[in-house]
Swiss-Prot record:
Protein name: Cytochrome b6-f complex subunit 4
Disulphide connectivity of cysteines: none
Subcellular localization: Plastid, Chloroplast thylakoid membrane
Predominant location category: plastid
Keyword annotations: Chloroplast, Electron transport, Membrane, Photosynthesis, Plastid, Thylakoid, Transmembrane, Transmembrane helix, Transport
Gene3D superfamilies on file: plastocyanin oxidoreductase (1.10.287.980), Single helix bin (1.20.5.510)
Top-level taxon: Eukaryota
TM regions (residue ranges): 36-56, 95-115, 131-151
Amino acid sequence: MGATKKPDLNDPVLRAKLAKGMGHNYYGEPAWPNDLSYIFPVVILGTIACTIGLAVLEPSMIGEPANPFATPLEILPEWYLFPVFQILRTVPNKLLGVLLMASVPAGSLTVPFLENVNQFQNPFRRPVATTVSLIGTAVALWLGIGAALPIDESLTLGLFQFDPTVEYKNLSIFYSYI
């Protein structure tokens, strides 16, 4: 063990700092156990009381009651399976759909090998991983939103529709000036 330097209490700069309260805890009692052992149970019991109170005062059903004699028109999975459901619904070949679903984790596992950087580096300085993550998030949101729509609107999310049976009068006015 090395020798530790003892503070020189005759130093006027150190004495001035100590006189102002610098160098030690001067703002009251410690947080543990005095404060936290009181606040933690109060917060936990308050949360439980609010949950029970809201459940008693305003009971709500979890979805619609089941009716075994009426099958819904389209059976949808839980919300977190919407992107997978959309892949299986839109791809005509089911084997291709399963392969597309298997390619998601396989592609995610290859990203660290594409980019040879330090794992503790700033994520915005890892452009391949950042781009793959952003594109994957956008595609998952697009597939998830599309799964909740009818099949004919699912790929375009209902934003772009063209019906050849409808006469578009605004376009005919536009083309008359050309």
